[in-house]
Amino acid sequence: MGVTVAEIKKRLSEADAEEFAVLERALVADERKGVRNALAVAKRRLQAEADEEARLASMYSFERSLCGENPHAVVVGLDEVGRGPLAGPLAVGAIVLPADPKIACLNDSKQVKPADRERIAAEVKRVALAWDVHYIEPSYIDDHGMTASLRLAFSSAVKAIEQAGVRPDVILLDGNPLHLDPREVNVVKGDGKCASIAAASIVSKVERDALMCRYAESYPEYHFAENKGYAS
């Protein structure tokens, strides 16, 4: 008895690139529609996995390229969340990642589904050499303005990293310069380009969202668990 379509589908769904190549050659003469469809699905899956692996590798390699001639530079990435909400603080995340292991699906937090953000944030915190999230309350922002608030939040987050025993050689900031430190390097749209900035964007988002959910327990009428303090 020949191999059933269901069995072939299962093998193809679990195959890596090397095994797929073997199966594809073995099935070249199999004209069953289910087999042809399964081959096409597996090929698309493997291509998507290869594309994601390349994207992730580029985030880490681009980050390394910003470190000049020091291949062992310690890099901290920073990003903020919570600009312009109706309620809740500004949050700035600071993350120092090791070169390995690389964190699957790491990306700008806005490009990541909420459930995936939770998983990625947990993995970032597990493998990070150091991490911190610093909050600035709305009253401080009202009194001092956003630029001063960002400067305080970013500098406080870096200080917390250093107090944890990790001294960064390079400080990567997403967006415009803040002139915090001579180690500062600014990367426009860095949360989609640099691994540590992406990690900071995800962790700060997850931590702030969790804070707003706790606020919702005290102020249920504002629905903070759903809106996280934003108007829409």
What residues fall within each predicted segment?
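RNase H-like, Mg2+-dependent phosphodiesterase core
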Residues: 1-76, 83-232
